[in-house]
């Protein structure tokens, strides 16, 4: 999901997406430990998406508009 698409979502939708991404990250890390993960760069992408969502939520909390 692109940052512009994320900014269009409501806080509730962003929190739901954040929870989904955290669950996905947990599953990817588990697969990595078991040696089942083929593409380890997917962990990096999920972590960046989590950071983007947290940034958007914090901007909204502080009243910063981009």
From Swiss-Prot:
Protein name: Large ribosomal subunit protein uL29
NCBIfam families given in the database record: L29 (TIGR00012)
Top-level taxon: Bacteria
GO cellular component: cytosolic large ribosomal subunit
Family: Belongs to the universal ribosomal protein uL29 family.
Pfam family, one: Ribosomal_L29
CDD domains (alphabetical): Ribosomal_L29_HIP
Protein keywords: Ribonucleoprotein, Ribosomal protein
Organism: Petrotoga mobilis (strain DSM 10674 / SJ95)
């Amino acid at each position: 999901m692109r940052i512009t698409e994320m900014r269009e979502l409501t806080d509730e939708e962003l929190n739901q997406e954040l929870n989904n991404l955290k669950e996905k990250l947990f599953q990817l890390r588990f697969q990595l430990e078991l040696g089942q993960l083929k593409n380890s760069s997917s962990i990096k992408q999920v972590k960046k998406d989590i950071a983007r969502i947290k940034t958007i939520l914090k901007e909204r909390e502080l009243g910063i508009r981009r």
